[in-house]
């Protein structure tokens, strides 16, 4: 039995890793301008090709951003589901992404109005502040309501309030600011630069490493707070760490790509079904890979389905993610009845 489980884990990770590699190649090659794998290999080898700028300045940064931010989004969802013991918790569902978007929009409008360039770090800091504000309200509501559905409804209401404030900000922004805000607030991986990719890679890699080393206390926490305390886990410190780390991940995603729906909720469940295990030591890296696969696939469809018109990434993630959430809710209700 133990041997068959190990084989399943190996197959699952191989499948996810190969899927990432295949989708990276597809995202780089497929588009309005077709680029062959031979041209990509030649360009990596230092040879000049016709579409070198499209490859290195547009498609590669965008593909890397989808890979990194997709993984971060799924990981943030997994941390929130673990924290709240709620299978449909996620940055978008709980309004955390909307809070990050609200403060990010306020900072963008204010700084651009003063003709000040908005740096990646500034936008991440602003989005983190917004994420923490929304998280604070969600935590406050979680103390008041014991029902899982009510917590989700509270998060959705917080999200609507934050979105309303964001729309108000956009209404009173000037034309140049509106274009930037509108594209960003819809959710998209377009317009990424290598500077953006480097900043997000550093922030998310550090966060991922910290989360990975928390796998053991998280495993104990999943079995109940009393058990975790008996195992020597500092529950208060663990909760604070989960709040901060999930907020950092959410802030980084919103700062660069805007709010993206359903990835954080759907991917952890799909990955758990693939692995046949909920162990954090497996779920943490698998969620990251799964989120990368999901966002790379959805971004490819968003770019190419109605080319040259591009869909927002949230439109595509909702199509594939929402049915998973419905499946989780139906399964939970059946388990309660049984």
Show which residues each predicted segment covers.
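Alpha-helical transmembrane segments in inner-membrane proteins
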Residues: 1-338
